[in-house]
Each structure stands twice: as C-alpha cells, then as structure tokens.
Amino acid sequence: MKKIIIKAAWFFAVVTSLNAQEVRKDSVLDSLHINSKKLELVDSIKLNWIATYDEALEISKKENKPILLYFTGSDWCAPCKVLDKELFHTEKFKELSDKNLVLLEVDIPRKHDLLSPDKISENLYLKEKYRVNSFPTLLFVNHKGKKISEKSGYVITEYYFPYIQSVVYNY
C-alpha cells in the first residue's frame, strides 16, 4: 500500500512540475541549435492566409490544392512562435504555399480578445473536429475536409519543409 501511495505522489509531482514549466522561445532555439539562415528568413513575407474554413474548402476544391490548417497558440505557445518565424516567414515556404497550398491559421489564443467571437468559435470547432491536442500542429485536409496528413508538436524547423513538400507531391 505504501508503494502505491509513494508512486502516486511521485507521479503527481512529476506531472505537476511538467505542466508548470514555461517554455521560452530563447531556450527552445538554444537547445535546438537552429541555423535560421538555411531557410532565408524574411520578416516582410506576407502569406495568403484564408479567413474562414468554408472559404478554404471552396478554394481547395476550385484550385485542387490541399488545405494546410496551422493550429497555433499565438500568444502563449513558444514552439509555435519559433515555427511561425522560421518556416512561415521564409521565401521558400511562400513560394511553395502560393503555388500548392490553401493556408488556414487556426489560432487558439489564451487572450480571447485577439480574435472575433466568430473566429474563436470556428477555431475551437476545428480543434475538436480534428482532435488536435498539441501545438503547433500542421494538419492537411482535402476540399471535403478529410484529413490527409498531420504533424503535431515541434521538431527542428528544417524537417517541416520536406514533410510539406511530400504532402503536396502526394496530393
């Protein structure tokens, strides 16, 4: 009985400490030793993010392109901020996405005043529909909303581009 109580207490302590840790963007970058020059960062890049899910489905059908749903926590998720900067703000990604993807950002911020109530509702609906539980998540769907591929969590930024290319190639 003592062993069970001790193991339960240890488990609770570990889970609590993991949830309490705040990940800083600097520590993520330092620990991964990312060479950001490889993807040629450009702060002024403007991607063509579509406003709504329904609009993204229409464009996907019309242009025969997969939809990339980017699930992020823009105001709290440090790995999301790194991915946003080091993947989505590159000339290489812009070129690929302009030709081959329909982009939809699904932001789940902690500060609800960052988005309209309608957009928050839509984003929460999409999070539940596709059962997204970790951030960042890149989820690809077809024009009917059927999931094609998904990559959850943060990995070194350079790994995302070949993954996205393979999804586009196989679509």
Language-model features: locations:
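Conserved redox-active cysteine motifs that mediate thiol-disulfide chemistry
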Residues: 72-88
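Short pre-active-site segment immediately N-terminal to redox-active cysteine/selenocysteine motifs
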Residues: 64, 72-76, 134
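Thiol-based oxidoreductase modules, predominantly thioredoxin-like and allied folds used
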Residues: 48-50, 86, 93-121
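Non-catalytic, surface beta->alpha helical segment in thiol-disulfide oxidoreductase systems
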Residues: 125-171
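Bacterial Sec-dependent N-terminal signal peptides
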Residues: 1-24
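Coil residues (strongly favoring Ser/Thr
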Residues: 26-27, 31, 44
